[in-house]
């Protein structure tokens, strides 16, 4: 119980203390395990591949793979597949279009995205869901310290509407090593918290990330995740 409480305090301090320092900050970077999006897209005529694998409490697991390409100068399209190995065996696909409204020229930027997704649960197909999101990013302290914020609207299962939000912070300890923390919601229940570390195996090309997270006030909803982001230079 003491360890569980300590972990929750660590998450809370990581997110809210950083947010208190960072109300003007964000460095856009590859974080394949974070749910909070940033206001950047892949470079023009380039692609990126992100994948993640989560080990969930109770023996279940889930994975996701998402390739994304910038088809022009300011229009990124991504296709995703995700699946969970548990009693329900949920799996599904998603497609997202994203564009930058204000580039990160100075200390902040804004983007918009629209995602369409569909899940299948125990051979039962759900309706097509859609999610409109507005990511904002801010830079501070020579782009080493940062903040991403998301606010969006989701039309989910059975056409249930939901205002979704997310706050993520990150700090670059060096050119290769960084730490991140975030809090976000996905439904009308308690929000989630997550802390991550990432390491650039190949600078600006290959990033490895590890994270731990849980839903607040829900001891059984915890996970450990591994993520990989690959951005080829060609």
Model-derived features with residue positions:
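Cleavable N-terminal export/targeting peptides
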Residues: 1-35, 234
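Transmembrane beta-barrel domains of Gram-negative outer membranes and organellar outer membranes
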Residues: 28-234
């Amino acid at each position: 119980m003491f360890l569980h409480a300590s972990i929750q305090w660590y998450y809370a301090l990581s997110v809210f203390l950083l947010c208190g320092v960072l109300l003007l900050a964000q460095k856009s970077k590859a974080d394949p395990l974070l749910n909070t999006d940033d206001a950047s897209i892949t470079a023009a005529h380039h692609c990126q591949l992100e994948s993640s694998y989560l080990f969930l409490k109770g023996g279940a697991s889930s994975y996701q793979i998402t390739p994304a390409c910038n088809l022009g100068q300011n229009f990124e399209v991504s296709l995703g597949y995700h699946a969970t190995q548990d009693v329900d065996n949920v799996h599904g696909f998603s497609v997202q279009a994203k564009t930058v409204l204000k580039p990160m020229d100075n200390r902040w930027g804004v983007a918009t995205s629209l995602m369409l997704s569909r899940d299948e649960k125990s051979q039962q197909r759900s309706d097509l869901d859609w999610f409109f999101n507005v990511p904002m990013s801010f830079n501070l302290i020579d782009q080493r310290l940062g903040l991403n914020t998301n606010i969006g609207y989701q039309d989910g299962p059975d056409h249930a509407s939901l205002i979704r939000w997310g706050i993520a912070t990150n700090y670059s300890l060096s050119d290769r090593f960084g730490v991140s923390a975030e809090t976000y919601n996905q439904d009308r229940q308690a929000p989630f918290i997550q802390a991550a570390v990432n390491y650039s195996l190949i600078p600006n090309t290959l990033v490895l990330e590890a994270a731990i997270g849980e839903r607040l006030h829900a001891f059984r909803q915890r996970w450990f995740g591994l993520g990989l982001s690959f951005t080829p230079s060609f």
